[in-house]
Amino acid sequence: MPTYFDQLERVRYEGPKTTNLLAFRHYNPDELVAGKRMEDHLRFAACYWHTFCWNGSDMFGVGAFERPWQQAGDALSLAKRKADVAFEFFHKLNVPYYCFHDVDVSPEGASLKEYLNNFAQMVEVLAQKQQESGVKLLWGTANCFTHPRYGAGAATNPDPEVFSWAATQVVTAMNATHQLGGENYVLWGGREGYETLLNTDLRQEREQLGRFMQMVVEHKHKTGFRGTLLIEPKPQEPTKHQYDYDAATVYGFLKQFGLEKEIKLNIEANHATLAGHSFHHEIASAIALGLFGSVDANRGDPQLGWDTDQFPNSVEENALVMYEILKAGGFTTGGLNFDAKVRRQSTDKYDLFYGHIGAMDTMALSLKVAAKMLEEGELDKRVARRYAGWNGELGQQILKGQMTLAELAQYAEQHNLAPQHQSGHQEQLENLVNYYLFDK
């Protein structure tokens, strides 16, 4: 079979001084960082949708890319050709994982019967590709937002028949993920929200969404799927407001429906931007809430109000993200999936490699900076000193519920408390982080 990327054998590590733009400068899969191989820390994945499904179209222009599998022809044959190219790409890029939506890998067809038949055939193709290449599935998911039937949502749709169709897609995609050895299953509610409150029953839709998630959890346990269920927060787009706005919002939703022990979060950098948060904030929040699962590594443009899905290129931003992840013990079933796409003007097929190589080097360098910060512990020491009072007798009595509000007021009066503000040393801490970032 002829290869698509015929000018490249494989992307390899050549070190910081290489001038080869199709080589890694910082990502060395076998390099030990904090006692673990870099590949095992980062758990990179390439996504099917942006890389092989997007044709370069946007709101103002038609497709700009010439991809052989996007031409007219038999849909199933073209899907198999796309799989050939995808796994050639995964292998040559040297990523251990990939991710997909159901209709990324398989044509939806004109009926539910066609959808099920096509997807079943393509799961067999993917299983064979995985066996041949050694590339594994980080997570699968179902696209319940693109088809016109989902104009008013899937789980939150006012029509229970649409809800049922979505359930069919999700159960089928979950089963496929299980069959393919996927380590997680992602739920992203692209249209689980509203565009106007004039035709929306918020309580009804929230109850529907909660029941849908409960059924997903029930199915997971019934089938014996041992992977992690993940919700991916996003505040808006394509709807005006989504119910999974950010990490904190999802936590409240999960608590309401008794799911906080069953579902974790897949945090995307660009979605944090849209929610008015930093990527660092959303990662730290997910960890603090006990919900951290996986990451969609990309970046947004703070000057634009939509999901640009650019490749991550800031070590300054991602070093702090990796610091939080390492401090929390690192990934378990999750990883760093590049939910990112080349720009519409990047029409050379090798631009797909340039985008991913730069992103992988960025995250590798971020990992090394984070590991050094964690090893030396200077940031942790300063934070610990700031909260040291809570380890004392008074702090512990408060936290353990041994004092009431009135007793605290009495304590303050009896001891004539006159606490003085202590500096937060923000500038010092920012300088400290820069020391690790730019230490040569």
Swiss-Prot record:
SUPFAM superfamilies: Xylose isomerase-like. It catalyses: alpha-D-xylose = alpha-D-xylulofuranose. Gene3D superfamilies: Divalent-metal-dependent TIM barrel enzymes. Binds 2 magnesium ions per subunit. Mg(2+) 1 binds at residues 232, 268, 296, 339. Its cofactor is Mg(2+). Keywords: Carbohydrate metabolism, Cytoplasm, Isomerase, Magnesium, Metal-binding, Xylose metabolism. It is found in: Cytoplasm. The keyword Magnesium applies. Disulfide bonds: none annotated. GO terms for biological process: D-xylose metabolic process. Its EC number is 5.3.1.5. GO terms for molecular function: magnesium ion binding; xylose isomerase activity. InterPro entries: Xyl_isomerase-like_sf (IPR036237), Xylose_isom_bac (IPR013452), Xylose_isomerase (IPR001998). PROSITE patterns: XYLOSE_ISOMERASE. Its main location: cytoplasm. The active site is at residues 101, 104. The keyword Isomerase applies. It is an enzyme of class 5 (isomerase). GO terms for cellular component: cytoplasm. Belongs to the xylose isomerase family. Homotetramer. This is Xylose isomerase. It comes from Cronobacter sakazakii (strain ATCC BAA-894) (Enterobacter sakazakii). The gene is xylA.
